[in-house]
Amino acid sequence: MARIAIEYCTQCRWLLRASWMAQELLSTFGTDLGEVALIPGTGGVFRITVDGDQVWERKADGGFPDISVLKQRVRDRVAPERDLGHVDRRDSEHTG
């Protein structure tokens, strides 16, 4: 089972944002996840990893992830066969 780590900046007060994203991932992926960890950091960090592989980094990716984009990136690593329902359909409507 996958381990997700969300490292967030305590100085920036991003705990609420990090915990909401953790809740969304747990609600979506449930027992496909072994752990979702919140890791306090500093210096404007907001990084999300799946089993040590970075799937989002605030500075490199230009801000915070839209939750549907984050779910797709996590899904691609954790359960590629999973249909995310409206998240996948909404994305295909915008690209097609």
Question: What are these regions, as identified by a protein language model?
Answer:
Residues M1-G96:
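Domain-level signature for proteins that mediate thiol-based redox and metal-cofactor handling
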